[in-house]
Amino acid sequence: MTPNIHHDKILILDFGAQYTQLIARRIREIGVYCEVWPWDHSPEEILSFGAKGIILSGGPESTTSPGAPAAPQHVFDSDLPIFGICYGMQTMAVHLGGATEAADKREFGHASVQVIYPDTLFSGLSDHPSEFRLDVWMSHGDHVSRVPPGFTITAATDRIPIAAMSREDKRWYGVQFHPEVTHTLQGQALLRRFVVDICGCQTLWTAANIIEDQIARVRERVGRDEVILGLSGGVDSSVVAALLHKAIGSQLTCVFVDTGLLRWGEGDQVMAMFEEHMGVNVVRINAASRYFDALQGVYDPEAKRKIIGNLFIQIFEEEASKRKQAKWLAQGTIYPDVIESAGSKTGKAHVIKSHHNVGGLPEQMTLGMVEPLRELFKDEVRRLGVALGLPHAMVYRHPFPGPGLGVRILGEVKPEYAELLAKADSIFIDELHQADLYDKVSQAFAVFLPVKSVGVVGDARAYEWVIALRAVETVDFMTAHWAPLPYDFLSTVSNRIINELRGVSRVVYDISGKPPATIEWE
C-alpha cells in the first residue's frame, strides 16, 4: 500500500527571501513534504493545511519600517512548532514582545556563532566541539535587540549578541543566520532537528514513494481516457512522458515538434529514447520549414520568441484535434512555477513572475490538465527521471531555452545559421564531456553572431562568421559567474570549430557575469 507521503508536512510562510525555495528543497531532501505560501495567506487555509510545523522565511524588508510584513497571530495560536529564519526570527521577536534594531551596516557572509545554551535545536551540533561554535552564513541588516518574554538567548556572534533564541515550552525557535545554504555547515542538521525531532515528521518523501503516489493519482484521474503530451526533449517533459507511460501505457500519446531549432541530432535522440527503447507512442512532426518561413526577416528577439511559441501552439493544436479520444493534456509544470504564479491575496507578498507553461496553450482546448510534477522542484524531477530509468546524461544535461536556437542566433534566423550553430554547440559540449568539465559548469552553449570577420584560408583572405562560446557557474541561475575554463581547452574547441565547420573564421569566449549580462544572449 502506498504511504500517504503528504501526511507529515511543513508549511513555509514566505516573506520574500531569495532563499525561500532553497529552504523547501532542503526539507524535501530530508524526506519531508513541504509547501511555500505567501506570509499573508488566509488564516483558515493555513490552519486547515494540516502542517506539523511552520517555518517563517527570511525577507528583504526591515521590521523597523512601518507596514513591514508581520508574522500572523494565528500562527502563534496554532500550538505548532515554529522556526523563524533571519527576517522570520525578527518578525517573531517583534510580534511576541521583543525588539529589533537596524545595524550600522549589513552583515553578509561567513560568521562564527557561539552556542550559549544548547536547546533542543542546537544540542550536540558543533563545527568546533570544544568551543560549541557553528560556521554559518549571515545576510541581514536588522537584528534582534531584545528577546520576547519567556525566550532564551541560545547563540551569539562577535557582532550581534542575539544570533538565535528559543522558547522550548512553546517549541518556538529563531536563528539570525541561514541554515538552508551550504555555507552553514550544520544547516541541514538543524533543519532535520526541527522537522524530524521537534515536529515529529516521518521521512516519507522519497523518489520511489513519489512515483508510486503519482501513478495512483494519474490512473484515478484519467481512467481509460487518452492523454496527450507536448514532448520537447527537455528534462521536465521527458520525466512526465516516462512517468505517464509507466502509469497508463498506450493511453499516452506524445507530440514531438521538430522545429529545426533543436540541439544537433536531438530529434533522433528523442525518438530513439522514447519510441524505440521505451515503447512510448510518439508522433514526430517535422516543422522546420514552417518555422524558418515564419522567422524570415524577423530580427527582434521578443518577436522571435512569440512567433516560435505561437507556432508551437498552432501545430500542437492541429495534432491534438486529430485525436478525438484525447480528454487530457499533460504538462511539465514544476513547483517553482506554482510558487511564482501564486501571488498573494493581499498583494503584499513577494511575487517573482507570472508563469505560462508551454507558451500558454489555447483556452479553447477543452482538455483536462494533468501535471504530475507540479509538486516537485527541478532537482527532485531529475531524481525521479533517474529512478524511472531515463539516462543520467538526459536527465542532468544543461538547460535549453524554449525557443531553442532561435534565441542563440542573433538577429534573423536562417536554416544555414541554425545548422552551423547546432554543429558548433555539439563540438563544444562534446569537448566538455571529453575533458570531464561538463558537470563542473552549470550551463554551456554556443551563440551564432551574424557578423563576418576576416580570416585567412590558405593564402587568401576570407570573411566568415563568428561563433561565441558561453559557460557559466551558478546555483540558482538568478546570478551567475562566467566559467574560467582552461585556455588549452578553449583552444581545442576553437580549433575544432574553425577546422570542421566551413563558414566560421573566429571563435570568442564570453566573460560576462549575470548581472549585468543575462545568461542567454537574447
UniProtKB/Swiss-Prot annotation:
Q: In which pathway does it act?
A: Purine metabolism; GMP biosynthesis; GMP from XMP (L-Gln route): step 1/1
Q: Which gene encodes it?
A: guaA
The enzyme's E.C. designation: 6.3.5.2
Which reaction is the catalytic activity of this chain?
A: XMP + L-glutamine + ATP + H2O = GMP + L-glutamate + AMP + diphosphate + 2 H(+)
- Which Pfam family, an example, fits this chain? NAD_synthase
Q: Which InterPro entries match?
A: Class_I_gatase-like, GATASE, GMP_synth_C, GMP_synth_GATase, GMP_synthase, GMPS_ATP_PPase_dom, NAD/GMP_synthase, Rossmann-like_a/b/a_fold
Keyword terms of this UniProt record: ATP-binding, Glutamine amidotransferase, GMP biosynthesis, Ligase, Nucleotide-binding, Purine biosynthesis
Q: What is this protein called?
A: GMP synthase [glutamine-hydrolyzing]
Q: What NCBIfam families is this protein classified in?
A: guaA_Cterm, guaA_Nterm, PRK00074.1
Naming one, the record's GO cellular component terms include: cytosol
This protein's source sits in the domain of life called: Bacteria
GO terms of molecular function = ATP binding; GMP synthase activity
Q: What does this protein do?
A: Catalyzes the synthesis of GMP from XMP.
Q: In which organism is this protein found?
A: Xylella fastidiosa (strain M12)
